[in-house]
């Protein structure tokens, strides 16, 4: 399972395992996660909507000659206020009460207008 951001993301990681993504209020970020829907996997994001807005949630199935339904899920977020905003993704399966896996991202958003005036 790979996770990437299509925005400027150097792969920095906090001591608690959270991946750090730096952005500005003007630039949305994308987080890509692999899902195997044949197994019933589904990534569920938890975040504070006062700090981040979810702009898109897309799924791209990987074509193959078999009945397996796996692919890449893309979540696109935009920061609505400056600061560090945590996004927790839990891989859920319909018949389980606990998460199969977790991914944590800290999105640090700066206000580009405050840089210009400084």
What are the residue ranges of the model-derived segments?
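Beta-strand-rich extracellular modules
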Residues: 90-94
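Beta-sandwich strand segments
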Residues: 95-102
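N-terminal edge beta-strand
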Residues: 2-31, 36
